């Protein structure tokens, strides 16, 4: 495929020609990117080009530094490969921006480094995205690969991460930036609190420009000798000659403030809310204050570590002391139903207190702290931005205080302060940035008599230093102090203490008297129900009783109908009758609301076993217009492209010789039951298909039904010049939701789109060619097929990186290509790996070694065996002379040339010269793909994490969000947990399991990873496409059903040994 660089020739930026013709030179940028740039952003690009692509863009947070850096790097694309170093939580947002603004980048050309051994795709990628967390001294394999690649263009986002001269990541990153020909540093806070934090960034861009470190420190950091006790220390934490430093920085740094370039942006209003605390709440804190004062008055102040440890303890005590008042303040804000706000805190105890306040107010929330994976943070941000019911975001200042966008919030609350103004301003501007439509009110909760007062004064002193250095004028955190009497109620807040003991749970657990309630005596006089008629509503036991009564009493059919409509379910008898006597359109009108059933927390669990996957007809379906027999997986007719009706999806095609009425009725009943199961499992899929169908019908219908945002199809002035395509090829991005377009010959069209945008009639990402009806219908057909796939199948298709015409056919082909060997063992063990390695050595020669995480290797004697053997990770015949059962590490094969072989596929992982540099532990796998497949098949925690990244803990059978309930249970006060479980879908679980959820809630109590094809049927050691998320209730029911089926199989097999089954004579032939 042609490379992106073959399209345009980048002009060589000359300093002399950028004075009057600078904006003209920006025409080199892609049209979509150029038109999106604001005037001040264009100035930033010109500033960088004048300095040959080496500068710092230090605009205030929220002014679009990312898009400026992408545009600057695009000018030098002939010099790529490009390295982008970002905080780990910002890797995927950066890739989204790259694919959005540079559509000529193909999915295979962007590489995200996932771990310290993921180096396989670095040499062949044009763009490599790397997280700061991987820049450690023990990442030798990764560092060697990065240095070998010789990146000519480097972007360092949030470059203030390099502030420390002694940090490992600063020492590693410094030579990489210095060696690159172009380097763009991005940060909204170059110095978080002191001028010393600027030196490493300046040194990376222009070595020795400001002299050596000693010279810089003496001149601008007021460096002097200071004594801590008897220890002599060089103190560089001061500031001096700031106006001179500001003038010198202007030559290498461009910085604009929102107040200067975005006058139309609503203002940011800071407000201090002081309040007093009751004496009982600050008792421990006062004792620490007295200890600190004694320590500072002593002639020898003692070790610095002792002083800093005491201050850290006081910081935490301040958080606990004011937590009760913060809870009351949050509850007060939640009384305004239209308010969405952010709450920032630092300590986990304060985050926990804020979360408890939201749960007690029965409001929906998100929480992002250091334990939340970076991929899940994007999902939570989207939830807060788009869901009107999610009203609160509880955020860690360090984990979520930079790089994320929360413009849906109009208020920001600081439950705690932090040590430097840089982090505070970064957190403020999560809401106050481009895209904000209302003024942002920022409230600082300041508890009098605590460390808050000292920290506020310190923040203002540091703000003056950073303001003079970066902006050329003294600044401070200007916040008006609100009326103290207005917030007087906070001083009467109940003290909050962390609930770590089990004493609170003595009266908050379930008992046998609560679980085994006395039954209604009238139930003994009612006929027993069949299993398919039993339905239980997890949240409403009364509704459960009502359904049983209605379903079992035929004299109350009228009441049954009304109840079914109200609860969103149809009785079995009514559903069978309507489907057998009415057409599909009337059935569609009478059907319940699928979306309501999917999103409601009152999920209906049936006693019958859950289906492993959506039920599809075995013999295909017949088009109602052209009568063509279609593949059962296609949602549209292959001949006439008519959308598949839901009636066709429910009914199997009957053979011509099957005219018996009873057989037909039985077939209809079974297929209808399967169709309803499919609806229950995949409501989003059906809704997406209906949405896509309606849009295509609108395109093909009359003029009044066409898309309002697009020109009239067939009446375009230049319609004759736009090419009409017979078909397109597609490639799904590995890391984002975007789909890249190719011609039928596999040539890139340099455009991409998000399927959800097409559903919402947003076509801006696609060129004018797609205004034509035929071209647009191809995209709509793709979106319809793509939406019909499960999230897991979409993920598998993305990771494959292949070109395809039809997502359904491509997914089916991937499933066929994957190994389908029967395996009744759940995981790969170390013994399996050892046997496979031994067999490889037997067949091909070489030797084996024991590798451990400590990088220790133990080589066994060389074994030259000529017998043939196919290496496999499946259990091999145990005919080995050596017992391969290492308690630690893995037995790995090494070939005759000294190359270690992959634990997964037994192919070489690296060359002999690379083996000497890399540790043995880092040479376990040949690629990231093999590594992921191995861990999925051998590590339960990794498997759960991968499934969670796709399905987010939502049950694929009943649609309940089990992860959300787990988070609420984990974060709720222990006294509230019982009421949460009583109102949730977990009421059917055993008493012991419910009480364990109360005492120590964990993810495994609420949702499980289930094998679609059971392990006992050969579905063990499988890939992700055979896994699904099930809530504990559904998983328990499915496990019970599978146990029953296995018992029946064993009983029948035992019976056949002594005679034939009599029931076989009753089966129709």
Swiss-Prot record:
A motif (PIP-box) lies at residues 518-525. SUPFAM superfamilies: P-loop containing nucleoside triphosphate hydrolases, Ran binding protein zinc finger-like. The gene is Zranb3. InterPro entries: Helicase_ATP-bd, Helicase_C-like, HNH, HNH_nuc, P-loop_NTPase, SNF2-like_sf, SNF2/RAD54-like_C, SNF2_N. Belongs to the SNF2/RAD54 helicase family. This is DNA annealing helicase and endonuclease ZRANB3. It comes from Mus musculus (Mouse). Its EC number is 3.6.4.-, 3.1.-.-. Keywords: ATP-binding, Chromosome, DNA damage, DNA repair, Endonuclease, Helicase, Hydrolase, Metal-binding, Multifunctional enzyme, Nuclease, Nucleotide-binding, Nucleus, Zinc, Zinc-finger. Residues 325-485 form the Helicase C-terminal domain.
């Amino acid at each position: 495929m042609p490379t992106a660089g073959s399209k345009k020739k980048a002009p060589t930026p000359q300093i002399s020609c950028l004075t009057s013709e600078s904006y003209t030179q920006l025409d080199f940028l892609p049209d979509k990117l150029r038109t999106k740039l604001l005037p001040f952003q264009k100035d930033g690009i010109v500033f960088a080009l004048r300095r040959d692509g080496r500068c710092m863009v230090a605009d205030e947070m929220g002014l679009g530094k990312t898009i400026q850096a992408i545009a600057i790097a695009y000018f030098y694309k002939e010099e790529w490969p490009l390295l982008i170093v970002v905080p780990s939580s910002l890797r995927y947002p950066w890739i989204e921006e790259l694919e959005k603004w540079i559509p000529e980048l193909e999915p295979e050309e962007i590489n995200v480094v996932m771990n310290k051994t993921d180096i396989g795709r670095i040499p062949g990628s044009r763009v490599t995205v790397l997280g700061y967390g991987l820049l450690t001294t023990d990442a030798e394999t990764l560092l060697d690969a990065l240095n070998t690649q010789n990146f000519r263009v480097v972007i360092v986002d949030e470059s203030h991460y390099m502030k420390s001269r002694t940090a490992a990541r600063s020492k590693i990153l410094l030579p990489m930036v210095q060696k690159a020909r172009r380097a763009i540093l991005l940060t909204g806070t170059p110095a978080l609190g002191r001028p010393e934090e600027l030196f490493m960034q300046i040194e990376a861009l222009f070595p020795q420009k400001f002299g050596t470190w000693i010279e810089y420190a003496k001149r601008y950091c007021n460096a002097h000798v200071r004594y801590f006790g008897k220890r002599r220390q060089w103190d560089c934490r001061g500031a001096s000659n700031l106006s001179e430093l500001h003038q010198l920085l202007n030559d290498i740094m461009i910085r604009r403030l929102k107040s200067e370039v975005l006058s139309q942006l609503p203002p940011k209003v800071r407000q201090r809310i002081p309040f007093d605390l009751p004496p009982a709440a600050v008792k421990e804190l006062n004792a620490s204050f007295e200890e600190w004062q004694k320590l500072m008055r002593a002639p020898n102040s003692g070790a610095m570590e002792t002083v800093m440890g005491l201050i850290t303890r006081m910081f935490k005590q301040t958080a606990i002391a004011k937590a009760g008042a913060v809870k009351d303040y949050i509850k007060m804000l939640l009384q305004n139903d239209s308010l969405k706000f952010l709450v920032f805190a630092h300590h986990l105890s304060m985050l926990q207190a804020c979360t408890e306040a939201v749960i007690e107010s029965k409001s929906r929330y998100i929480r992002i702290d250091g334990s939340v994976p970076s991929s899940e943070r994007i999902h939570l941000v989207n939830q807060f931005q788009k869901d009107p019911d999610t009203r609160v975001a509880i955020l860690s200042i360090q984990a979520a205080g930079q790089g994320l966008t929360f413009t849906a919030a109009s208020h920001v609350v600081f439950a705690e302060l932090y040590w430097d103004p840089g982090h505070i301003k970064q957190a403020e501007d999560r809401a106050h940035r481009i895209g904000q439509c209302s003024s942002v009110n920022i409230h600082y909760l300041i508890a009098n008599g605590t460390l808050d007062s000292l920290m506020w004064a310190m923040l203002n002193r540091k703000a003056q230093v950073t303001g003079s250095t970066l902006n050329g004028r003294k600044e401070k955190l200007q916040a008006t102090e609100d009326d103290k009497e207005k917030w007087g109620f906070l001083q009467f807040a109940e003290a909050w203490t962390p609930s770590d003991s089990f004493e609170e749970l003595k009266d908050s657990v379930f008992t046998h008297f609560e679980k085994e309630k006395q039954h209604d005596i009238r139930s003994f006089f009612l006929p027993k129900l069949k299993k398919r008629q039993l339905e239980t509503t997890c949240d409403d036991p009364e509704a459960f009783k009502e359904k049983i009564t209605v379903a079992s009493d035929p004299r109350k059919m009228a009441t049954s109908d009304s109840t079914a409509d109200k609860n969103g379910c149809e009785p079995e008898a009514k559903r069978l009758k309507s489907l057998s006597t009415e057409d599909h359109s009337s059935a569609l009108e009478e059907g319940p609301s699928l979306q309501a059933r999917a999103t409601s927390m009152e999920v209906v669990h049936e006693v019958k076993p859950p289906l492993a996957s959506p039920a599809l007809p075995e013999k295909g379906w017949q088009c109602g217009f052209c009568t063509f027999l279609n593949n059962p997986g296609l949602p549209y007719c292959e001949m006439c492209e008519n959308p598949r009706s839901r009636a066709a999806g429910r009914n199997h095609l009957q053979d011509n010789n099957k005219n018996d009425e009873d057989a037909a009725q039985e077939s209809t009943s079974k297929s209808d039951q399967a169709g309803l199961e499919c609806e229950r499992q995949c409501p989003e899929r059906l809704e997406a298909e209906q949405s896509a169908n309606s849009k295509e019908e609108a395109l093909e219908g009359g003029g009044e039904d066409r898309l309002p945002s697009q020109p009239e199809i067939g009446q375009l002035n230049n319609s004759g010049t736009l090419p009409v395509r017979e078909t397109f090829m597609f490639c799904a991005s590995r890391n984002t939701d975007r789909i890249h377009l190719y011609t039928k010959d596999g040539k890139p069209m340099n455009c991409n789109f998000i399927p959800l945008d097409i559903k919402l009639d947003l076509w801006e990402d696609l060129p004018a060619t797609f205004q034509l009806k035929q071209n647009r219908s191809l995209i709509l057909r793709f979106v319809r097929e793509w939406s019909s796939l499960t999230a897991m199948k979409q993920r598998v298709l993305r990771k494959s990186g292949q070109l395809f015409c039809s997502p359904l056919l491509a997914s089916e082909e991937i499933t066929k290509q994957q190994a389908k060997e029967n395996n009744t063992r759940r995981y790969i063990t170390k013994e399996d790996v050892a046997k496979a390695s031994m067999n490889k050595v037997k067949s091909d020669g070489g030797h084996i070694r024991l590798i451990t995480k400590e990088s220790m290797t133990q080589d066994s004697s060389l074994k030259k065996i000529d017998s043939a053997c196919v290496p496999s990770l499946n259990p091999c015949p145990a005919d080995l002379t050596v017992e391969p059962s290492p308690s630690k590490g893995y037995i790995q094969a090494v070939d005759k040339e000294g190359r270690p072989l992959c634990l997964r596929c037994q192919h070489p992982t690296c060359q002999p010269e690379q083996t000497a540099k890399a540790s043995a532990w880092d040479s376990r796998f040949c690629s990231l793909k093999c590594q992921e497949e191995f861990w999925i098949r051998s590590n339960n925690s990794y498997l759960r994490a991968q499934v969670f990244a796709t399905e987010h803990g939502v049950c694929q059978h009943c649609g309940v969000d089990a992860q959300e309930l787990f988070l609420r249970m984990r974060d709720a006060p222990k006294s509230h947990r019982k009421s949460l479980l009583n109102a949730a879908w977990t009421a059917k679980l055993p008493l012991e399991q419910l009480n364990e959820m109360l005492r120590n809630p964990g993810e495994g109590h609420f949702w499980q990873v289930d094998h679609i094809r059971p392990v006992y049927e050969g579905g063990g050691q499988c890939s992700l496409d055979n896994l699904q998320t099930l809530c504990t209730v559904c998983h328990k029911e499915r496990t019970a059903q599978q146990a029953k089926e296995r018992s029946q199989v064993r009983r029948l097999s035992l019976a056949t040994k002594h005679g034939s089954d009599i029931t076989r004579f009753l089966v129709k032939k």
